[in-house]
Structures are given as C-alpha cells and as structure tokens.
Amino acid sequence: MMVKLLLLFLVCWSALPLESSPLGNRYNLEIGEKQYYISLAKTNWFEASNHCRQNGGFLLNLESREELELLSPHLHPAYSYWLSINDLGERGVYVSEATGLEAPFLNWSAGEPDNSSGYDRCVELWLSTTSFQMNDLPCYSSVAFICQLN
C-alpha cells in the first residue's frame, strides 16, 4: 500500500510544470530558439521587470504576430500578463523596456490604448474575447508576467 501511495505521489508531482520562485509559481517554456517563463504571481510592472532582470532576462518583448500565436496556447485565459512595453518616456510612444526601442509589434484590443484611468502607462497581454491582445494599464496594477530569458 505504501509503495502505491509513493508511486501515486511521484506521478502527480512529476506532472506539475510549475517551479518555485520568489514571486510564486512559474511555468518554464521553450519555443524555437526562445526561452520564457510565465509567472502566475501577480505583481506590479516594476517588480515584474526587476524579477526578470534578476533572473537573467527581461519582460516579454513580443516581436511578431507569429510569436504571439505560438505563445498564446500556453497562457491561462484567466490571467493577464505584463509585457516589456510602456509609454513612460513619452505618452503615446510605446517603447520596449527590453530594447529601449519602439515596440516592434503592437496588437491592441479594440479601443486601446485608451488611458482610461489617466495613468495607463504600461502594457498587459489579456484575453479579449477570443484571442490575447494588448491593453494599457496603470503600472502599479498587479497582474502576472512573462519573462524572456534570451
């Protein structure tokens, strides 16, 4: 009986894709040449960016629709995720914090960016109807995040 319980425990434990990190659980992922980890811990944009940098990466810098489509099936629909994009330097000019250059790919939800709070300066990826799209949000909001490691 004890052996069966031990085997059951090992099977269940090995099926879990999440690893522990200071900000909660994360899911490691490799797509092509790129490595990501998806953290389900909710935090503000600044803490998320710092966490990625401390782990040798940066917040996700989406470069194309193709990259978004490859990544989307791995994202939980109940979560939204910080990206590296913000307009903290100049309102309306969306720059990737990862590169310091204008964001190479923007896929806004209908009506976005709208700066609805008056402080929407950072960009999240969220499920808008049937696909993940971008939304501007106050940087101190707490959402999950995606780090890119290379």
From Swiss-Prot:
The keyword Disulfide bond applies. The lineage of its organism: Eukaryota, Metazoa, Ecdysozoa, Arthropoda, Hexapoda. Pfam families: Lectin_C. One of its GO terms (molecular function) is carbohydrate binding. SUPFAM superfamilies: C-type lectin-like. It is found in: Secreted. GO terms for biological process: calcium-dependent cell-cell adhesion via plasma membrane cell adhesion molecules; encapsulation of foreign target; immune response; melanization defense response. Disulfide bonds join C52-C147, C122-C139. GO terms for cellular component: external side of plasma membrane; extracellular region. This is C-type lectin 37Db. Glycans are attached at N107, N115. The keyword Secreted applies. Galactose-specific lectin that displays calcium-dependent activity. Binds to the surface of hemocytes and enhances hemocyte encapsulation and melanization. This is likely by interacting with carbohydrates on the surface of the hemocytes. Also displays agglutination activity against the Gram-negative bacterium E.coli. Residues 1-20 form the signal peptide.
